[in-house]
């Protein structure tokens, strides 16, 4: 049976038809790579909130902004303390050029200009110690300033080192090595109609305590007539009988049964592409090497769900008895050999669709009557 390859660039995100009938689909809440598309706007004091949680703010910065900020911080501390050293030398009379006084002891040796004060600040903070410029016992406030500079800059260096290590050690990069199938399929598994996705761990190091869950996001109208733009419904996935903590050592398929309790129970081959929803899939796991908790995310819209297809097997057994995961087959799907579930009687499907439409009209009528009674 021929397989269809659905790569990241070739898989259709939105199918268009020529002529009349074009429909604008709702924007994605989450991208395929797991990044949020929600824009936070018009928050009072948002910059103050970021400053109050400075640790998280700095860690979340992009590397180019982080490096620029830290380089500017070091240069500013060198310059600011250098200006203060220069002011101390000026007040003490160490900058009076042309007057030689053997009895005059400067606060800082060899600091007779702003450049010299800047170099002394840099050498003191970085503990270079060339030996030309040094502080004397003449000015206690200069000694106090030197101690304050070393304490403050040490705290800054600790903060910088901590944020660098925390950003490097974040499990975010580990989550990027978890691969989701670009599309989802609906097929029969053990006699039940299921929504199926594939997940793979791209590293040899294992992920422990894996938990995969889903959230269905769609517009919902309550009985009171309130319209919820993003109503969340839980979508449960399982792998065979290991629904609690699957062993993700090989690429695995996760199933969601489309039964009476499923929020996707109304899907049919006819209305699948007409639906407006987004299925967000989340995989939470613990990294074996660091014990850090990571989360990998993706989302599926109706145009990325294929009815009557199944995934091409990825895992095979080599000649020398080893399991082999062929990722060239990971994005390939093929027509399911069991066509009974999508070749059902058309009259039955029309009748079911008619019942659903009548039920929807009754709910809208009840909500309208309730609104009129409240008025």
Curated annotation (Swiss-Prot):
The chain crosses the membrane at residues 61-87, 140-165. A motif (Selectivity filter) lies at residues 127-132. Residues 1-60, 166-375 are cytoplasmic. InterPro entries: Ig_E-set, IRK_C, K_chnl_inward-rec_Kir, K_chnl_inward-rec_Kir1.3, K_chnl_inward-rec_Kir_cyto, Kir_TM. One of its GO terms (cellular component) is membrane. Residues 114-130 dip into the membrane without crossing it. Keywords: Cell membrane, Ion channel, Ion transport, Membrane, Potassium, Potassium transport, Transmembrane, Transmembrane helix, Transport, Voltage-gated channel. Residues 88-113, 131-139 are extracellular. Can form heteromultimeric channels with Kir5.1/KCNJ16. Interacts with PATJ. Inward rectifier potassium channels are characterized by a greater tendency to allow potassium to flow into the cell rather than out of it. Their voltage dependence is regulated by the concentration of extracellular potassium; as external potassium is raised, the voltage range of the channel opening shifts to more positive voltages. The inward rectification is mainly due to the blockage of outward current by internal magnesium. This is ATP-sensitive inward rectifier potassium channel 15. The lineage of its organism: Eukaryota, Metazoa, Chordata, Craniata, Vertebrata.
């Amino acid at each position: 049976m021929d397989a269809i390859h659905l790569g990241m660039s070739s898989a259709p995100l939105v199918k268009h038809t020529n002529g009349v009938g074009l429909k604008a689909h709702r924007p994605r809440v989450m991208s395929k790579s797991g990044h949020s598309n929600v824009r936070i706007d018009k928050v009072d004091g948002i910059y103050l909130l970021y400053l109050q949680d400075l640790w998280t703010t700095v860690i979340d910065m992009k590397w180019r902004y982080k490096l620029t900020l830290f380089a500017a911080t070091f240069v500013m501390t060198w310059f600011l303390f250098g200006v203060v050293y220069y002011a101390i030398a000026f007040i003490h009379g160490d900058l009076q050029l042309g007057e030689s006084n053997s009895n005059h002891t400067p606060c800082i040796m060899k600091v007779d200009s702003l450049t010299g004060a800047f170099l002394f600040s840099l050498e003191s903070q970085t503990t270079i110690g060339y030996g030309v410029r040094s502080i004397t016992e003449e000015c206690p406030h200069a000694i106090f300033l030197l101690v304050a500079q070393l304490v403050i800059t040490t705290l800054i260096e600790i903060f910088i080192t901590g944020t660098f290590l925390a950003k490097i050690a974040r499990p975010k990069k580990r989550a990027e090595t978890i691969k989701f199938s670009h599309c989802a399929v609906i097929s029969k598994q053990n006699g039940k109609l299921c929504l199926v996705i594939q997940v793979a761990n791209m590293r040899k190091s294992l992920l422990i305590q894996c938990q995969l869950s889903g959230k269905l996001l769609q517009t919902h109208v309550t009985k009171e007539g309130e319209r919820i733009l993003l109503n969340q419904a839980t979508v449960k996935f399982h792998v065979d009988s290991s629904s609690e903590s699957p062993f993700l050592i090989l690429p695995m398929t996760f199933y969601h049964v489309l039964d009476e309790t499923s929020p996707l129970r109304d899907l049919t081959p006819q209305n699948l592409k007409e639906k407006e929803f987004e299925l967000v899939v989340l995989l939470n796991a613990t990294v074996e090497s660091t014990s850090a908790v990571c989360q990998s995310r993706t989302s599926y819209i109706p145009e990325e769900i294929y009815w009557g297809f199944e995934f091409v097997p990825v895992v095979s057994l080599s000649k020398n008895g080893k399991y082999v995961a062929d990722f060239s087959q990971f994005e390939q799907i093929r027509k399911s050999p069991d066509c009974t579930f999508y070749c059902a009687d058309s009259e039955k499907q029309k009748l079911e669709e008619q019942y659903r439409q009548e039920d929807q009209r009754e709910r809208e009528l009840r909500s309208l009557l309730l609104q009129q009674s409240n008025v």
